[in-house]
């Protein structure tokens, strides 16, 4: 369930990056600056929302917290589809139109500045709603991981569900441009956004805490609680500001602050880079294959979750040292991205491979730093 939620999360996030250059920009007269503004504000709002998402999930519980998160971001994802109709209403007074009619109406308006201003504003609003919901995915998923896995296995569990981000990005180039080409970019947002509502129904039926789950037997409960945890006991309430006293809070925050920009930069701009430099469109088979290979290479990140368990079980290292060694190994992968630009003139496959390896390194590194927040607190 966590894997599929994260897959949907990244599918929703990728719709804009795979449609804006070839489908949305010509309609609304966007430039790279407009798209960059939208993605930057999304990232900022996502980061701010993360400050409160974990506390929200702790307060209302894992099950309800996840439902709220995916419900909000699915609504936000679907709202993107109606930005064209609303723009048509604002700039031309035509509100009761379909997607195709809205595009035709906007094309007849000569005031491109107004079209740009209105459409960018609407997409920013939709993006902020998406960010608000998506910020809850990882806190809820990590909390679920802490409930179902002992400390030594959490990095592996985290890397497995975090692979949903890669699989989501992997599925995106072979589905989203095809939907946009066949039925319009609006349907791409609606179709992918609807997946979240399907997931919500399954989550309501399936999720239960381990000690309340009839599919978890006593020996499995003992394995889960081998670190001395007892989910039946009332947890100590930790004030929000008290978290700032923990070293792992600052280590996690600083680590994500310094590294997430790398992931989001590659995620948001790689399709546009291929289009601008190599004239490879996201809707072309060549472009779909290139992006597919990019994220296929990123699946190497699964090793980042397995390696700490190997160090603990085979090398007798403690979980913390095992994670730190793993993070050091995969941090070196990002250096390969430095060769993407200078060697890119040889073939577009070189930056694809270099960036793919760098993204794998980031995701493996990220899977391990995610576990630090739950392994050294009373979760």
Predicted regions, residues:
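Helix-loop-helix hairpin linking two adjacent transmembrane segments in secondary transporters
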Residues: 166-210
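Extracytoplasmic
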Residues: 1-24, 30, 266-271
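Conserved small/polar residues in nucleotide/adenosyl-binding loops
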Residues: 377-378
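Residue-level signature of mid-helix packing/kink "hotspots" within the transmembrane helices
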Residues: 14, 43-51, 169-170, 298-302
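Cytoplasmic helix-loop-helix junction between adjacent transmembrane helices
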Residues: 126-163
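Extracytoplasmic gate region of multi-pass secondary transporters
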Residues: 17-18, 247-295, 302, 366
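C-terminal ends and interior cores of transmembrane alpha-helices
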Residues: 71-103, 107-116, 332-345
């Amino acid at each position: 369930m966590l894997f599929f939620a994260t897959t949907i999360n990244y599918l929703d996030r990728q719709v804009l990056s795979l449609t804006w250059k070839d489908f949305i920009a010509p309609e609304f007269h966007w430039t790279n600056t407009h798209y960059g503004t939208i993605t930057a504000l999304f990232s900022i709002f996502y980061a701010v929302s993360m400050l409160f998402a974990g506390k929200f999930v702790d307060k209302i519980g894992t099950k309800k917290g996840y439902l709220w998160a995916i419900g909000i971001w699915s609504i936000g994802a679907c709202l993107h589809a109606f930005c064209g109709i609303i723009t048509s209403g604002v700039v031309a007074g035509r509100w009761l139109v379909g997607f195709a009619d809205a595009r035709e109406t906007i094309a007849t308006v000569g005031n491109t500045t107004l079209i740009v201003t209105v459409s960018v504003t609407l997409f920013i609003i939709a993006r902020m709603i998406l960010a608000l919901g998506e910020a809850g995915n990882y806190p809820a998923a990590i909390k679920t991981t802490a409930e179902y896995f002992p400390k030594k296995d959490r990095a592996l569990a985290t890397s497995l569900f975090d692979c949903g981000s890669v699989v989501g990005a992997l599925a995106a180039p072979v589905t989203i441009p095809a939907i946009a080409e066949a039925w319009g970019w609006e349907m791409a947002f609606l179709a992918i956004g609807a997946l979240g509502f399907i997931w919500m129904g399954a989550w309501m039926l399936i999720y239960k805490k381990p000690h309340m789950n009839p599919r978890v037997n006593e020996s499995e409960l003992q394995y889960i609680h081998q670190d001395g945890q007892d989910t039946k006991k009332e947890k100590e309430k930790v004030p929000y500001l008290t978290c700032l006293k923990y070293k792992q809070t600052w280590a996690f925050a600083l680590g994500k602050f310094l590294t997430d920009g790398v992931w989001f930069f590659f995620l948001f701009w790689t399709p546009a880079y291929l289009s601008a430099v190599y004239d490879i469109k996201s809707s072309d088979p060549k472009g779909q294959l290139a992006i597919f290979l990019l994220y296929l290479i990123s699946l190497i990140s699964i090793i980042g979750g397995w390696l700490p368990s190997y160090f603990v079980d085979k090398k007798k290292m403690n979980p913390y040292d095992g994670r730190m060694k793993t993070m050091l190994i995969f941090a070196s992968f990002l250096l390969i991205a430095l060769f993407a630009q200078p060697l890119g003139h040889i073939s577009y496959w070189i930056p694809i491979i270099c960036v793919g390896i760098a993204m794998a390194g980031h995701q493996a590194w990220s899977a391990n730093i995610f576990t630090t927040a739950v392994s050294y607190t009373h979760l």
